[in-house]
Amino acid sequence: MKPIIPPQNLSELLERANMMAGISLAQIAAHRGITVPKDLKRDKGWVGQLIEMELGATAGSKPEQDFLHLGVELKTIPIDSKGKPLETTYVCVAPLTNIEGLTWQDSLVCHKLQRVLWVPVEGERHIPVGDRRVGTPILWEPDLQEQRLLQQDWEEIMELIALGKVEKLTARHGEVLQLRPKAANSKALTQSIAEDGSLKMTNPRGFYLKTAFTAMLLNKVFG
C-alpha cells in the first residue's frame, strides 16, 4: 500500500475531501487495504486515522497541524441523522507545568484552531462502522467572536492550572472549550502545579471543544 502524497495546496486538499463526501468508510478502507473494526470501543481513533491517511495528513500524533505546510488542522466529527455532533472534539494535550508567560497566541490550542478542515462522519451506533458515510467537508477559520470565546476559556482554564487548581476544573468549566482527563487509563500520571507552587502528580488533561460550539459551526454552514 503506497502512502498518499500530501496535498500540495489548499484546493487539492479540499478536492480530496469533497471526493470522499457520500462514500462509506468500508469503501475508503477497502481502497487502502485496511480492515474495518466491528466497533470502535477499542479503536476510538480509527475513523480519524482512516480519513487522515486518505487525505495524506502528515502530523500523526505530533503537536502540530495535520497539514502544517498548508496551515490546516484536520478534525473528523461524528454526527447524528440531524447533523448534530455526537461528542466533544479533542484539540490537544494541556500543558500543566512550565506555563509561566504562555499566552493564547503562543498556545497549541490557538495554533491548531486557526484553520480547521471539519469532516463530518455518520456516528450513530446502530449504523455498522463500515456503512457510515462521510459528509461534506467544511474549511473553517474562527471569526473574531469565536476567537474571543476560545481565548477567554483558555485563559481562565490556564489561570486555574497556574494556581494549582487543576483538580477543581471540571468539564462544565468554559463556554466553548473544556479541560478533561486525557488518558484512557486513569493510572497514567504526569506532573502538574500544586496550590503551594510545588509539583504534584495528576492525570494528563486535554482540551476539548464542547458540542454546543461545534454544532453552531456546522449549523452556520448547513443550517
From Swiss-Prot:
Listed Pfam families: MutH
Top-level taxonomic group: Bacteria
Any one annotated GO CC term: cytoplasm
Record InterPro entries: DNA_mismatch_repair_MutH, DNA_rep_MutH/RE_typeII_Sau3AI, DNA_rep_MutH/T2_RE_sf, Restrct_endonuc-II-like
Matches recorded under CDD domains: MutH-like
UniProt keyword annotations, A-Z: Cytoplasm, DNA damage, DNA repair, Endonuclease, Hydrolase, Nuclease
Main subcellular location: cytoplasm
GO molecular function: DNA binding; endonuclease activity
Compartments it resides in: Cytoplasm
Single GO BP term: mismatch repair
Function: Sequence-specific endonuclease that cleaves unmethylated GATC sequences. It is involved in DNA mismatch repair.
Protein family: Belongs to the MutH family.
Listed HAMAP family: MutH
Identification of the protein by name: DNA mismatch repair protein MutH
